[in-house]
A protein has these predicted regions:
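N-terminal, post-signal-peptide region of Sec/Tat-exported proteins
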Residues: 29-67
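Generic short N-terminal amphipathic or hydrophobic helices
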Residues: 1-2
């Protein structure tokens, strides 16, 4: 006879409070020597209203994670091209006239927003006519940054939560790969079809690498 206690099958209820205890893992990159993966684990604190992060390394070949205090010198800056000549960045660029005073210059005090499509707001971010664009520049002081998306009313990094994970150098330093949903107005609001684009820094040409994939392409 096998006697088993029902308590052995008891499981903790997955409550909102339990979810807050789970660590959020974020990969930071490969170490400069290529031997370790560097990542952080952020655990939210309801009482402190913030997340507390701990940093770790783990061998790429497998093994145990080791806690580290600083990661600044462990991971190469991914925004610097592999050949060291260029650096990537992003900034907002005004590409649309949304404010009433921009559309009607004679109404200098107008503070209304004028929209012609459904893309007036993305979650918690209003469309104010400015869009995130990717730039590159020579890796030296006071170098002029070049917009790889000139005059385009699209965002990369993606709004509202995209960051510098939305763009990266190709291994040969000749191209920039970036994530973007190149749709405008109501089409933008009704679609999640982001794509991966490749910008050639020599020819200035942009190629859609995932045109056949009608989905949320990010990697």
């Amino acid at each position: 006879t096998i006697i088993m206690s029902t308590n052995s099958f008891a499981q903790e209820v997955l409550s909102p409070e339990t979810l807050w205890k789970l660590g959020r893992v974020t990969p930071l990159g490969i170490s400069v020597d290529g031997k370790n993966i560097v990542y952080k684990v952020a655990i939210p604190s309801v009482e402190e209203n913030k997340s507390n992060s701990t940093f770790y390394t783990i061998p790429v070949t497998g093994g145990n994670a080791v806690e580290v205090k600083e990661t600044k010198d462990l991971v190469k800056d991914k925004n610097i091209s592999p050949d060291g000549k260029y650096i990537l960045s992003s900034q907002e660029v005004k590409t649309e006239n949304i404010l009433g005073k921009d559309i009607y210059p004679e109404l200098k005090k107008a503070d209304a927003y004028v929209y012609n499509g459904l893309d007036y707001r993305h979650w918690d971010t209003w469309n104010n006519g400015s869009h995130n664009h990717v730039f590159y520049a020579e890796n030296k002081e006071k170098a002029k940054a070049i917009d790889i998306m000139p005059n385009e009313p699209y965002d990369s990094p993606q709004k509202p939560f995209g960051g510098d994970e939305d763009y990266i150098w190709s291994p040969d330093s000749k191209s920039i790969i970036y994530v973007c949903k190149k749709k405008f107005g109501t089409d933008y609001a009704l679609s999640t079809n982001t794509d991966l684009y490749e910008y050639n820094i020599e020819t200035k040409a942009t190629t859609n690498l995932t045109e056949s994939n009608k989905g949320y392409d990010k990697n």
